[in-house]
């Protein structure tokens, strides 16, 4: 719905957002043809959005569940919903999401890290939250920790090691780690998800 509203001008958005929404709608049409190699898996899209909305916002007077805004649903749903027809792998291996200050970049990245860390079935993955300085890398890491610590059920699936900025994902044996600009610490690692 978000893509339709943006293209129709109901939701005001910048040029690149309009183009992304138009591509999404065009690709939905192309996916109906046999030679097109991608399809949109509505269930996979809804799975990550539903996961996000089960998370708890720890900040504030009262804890409450996440309510994803339409643009956040579009981002999460597109990343997880578009798949290859041949093997069902995710279509997008990289994405660039640009948001203004205080518009939830770390929040969205925290959702992605929690979901891909333990709940999409990939085993022994490495998820890195990276930045030039450790304090910056810790912003997303801390968001993930807040999600985990504010939900008793979720905390059973993760083990947080704050002293070395690492989270063990107990279901998949994956690891989430905050790293700073020391590129040597990334040598030899294949990231399943890299957050920069």
Q: What residue ranges belong to the model's regions?
A:
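Phosphate/NTP-binding elements of NTP-utilizing enzymes
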Residues: 1-196
């Amino acid at each position: 719905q978000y893509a339709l509203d943006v293209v129709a001008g109901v939701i005001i958005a910048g040029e690149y957002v309009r183009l992304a929404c138009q591509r999404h709608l065009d690709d939905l049409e192309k996916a109906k043809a046999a030679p097109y190699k991608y399809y949109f898996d509505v269930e996979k899209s809804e799975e990550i959005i539903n996961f996000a909305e089960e998370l708890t916002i720890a900040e504030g007077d009262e804890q409450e569940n996440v309510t994803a805004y339409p643009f956040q649903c579009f981002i999460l749903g597109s990343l997880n919903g578009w798949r290859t027809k041949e093997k069902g792998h995710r279509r997008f291996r990289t994405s660039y999401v640009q948001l203004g200050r205080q518009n939830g970049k770390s929040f969205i990245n925290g959702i992605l890290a929690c979901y891909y860390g333990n709940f999409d079935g990939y085993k022994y993955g490495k998820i890195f939250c990276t930045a030039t300085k450790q304090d910056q890398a810790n912003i997303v890491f801390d968001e993930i920790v807040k999600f985990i610590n504010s939900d008793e059920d979720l905390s059973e699936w993760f083990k947080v090691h704050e002293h070395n900025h690492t989270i063990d994902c107990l279901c998949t044996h994956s690891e989430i780690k905050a790293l700073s600009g020391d590129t040597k610490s990334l040598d030899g690692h294949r990231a399943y998800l890299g957050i920069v």
